Amino acid sequence: MNVVPRKSLGQHFLVDENILGVIERLAELGPDDVVLEIGPGLGVLTRFLAARVAHVHAVELDRRLEAELAGIERTTLHWGDALRLDLASLAPSPSKLVANLPYNVATPIVAESLARTDLLQWCVMVQREVADRFFATPRTKAYGSVSVLVQLATRRTGFHPVSRDVFRPRPNVDSALVAFTRIGPGADPGVKRVVEAAFSHRRKTLANALALAGAASRERAVAALQEIGRGASVRAEELAPDEFVTLAEALA
């Protein structure tokens, strides 16, 4: 490996091919699939995907990896920030996101990808605590805005702990593969705005958090909570994902 991973980019390159079979199973790869991969690194997963699917769109920020990623069959390389990529411009259009996501952008990448309704399945390698957040239940420490957004759009279909030894450099945290599939369009912009505001001040009551974030006055928030059967003292982590939809409707 000639490229030194950069901590600033959250790079932990996948180097052990033994995990690839698990990815293939959890991602339910098929010959007609078009896959989006973000953070291909040294191309270990990219080559594996390209040999099994119709097309791979690989998005990489680090130009030092050009030599590692050049010439992979059935693969289009996109250089730049994945969070600024216009997924609608990709042709053919990907229906699956399969990736060893960079640690420092894994959560926003997944959250933003939910808005693309043509993406139907995800299989991502992330920090274990991030994977736990995606499908955390209300009233738990891990439950937050990304939990609500992910669960409004998807259901979990697979989970697999990943050894630290499959990466270089070896990370100081545990990782996991988590797979999920779309069940609906997910949160619209109004719901997303309420969810993010609700969790922006976790130590406050939900009504106060919404007021502090500028999403609604406290009085209006309390009235909306009462409309959905919740009291003024409820906190964001007590509401189930679908309750945020009804709350947003009450606030509209």
Model-derived features: positions:
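Catalytic cores of RNA-modifying enzymes
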Residues: M1-A197, Q226, E237, T246-E249
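Amphipathic alpha-helical segments within well-ordered protein domains
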Residues: E196, A207-A211
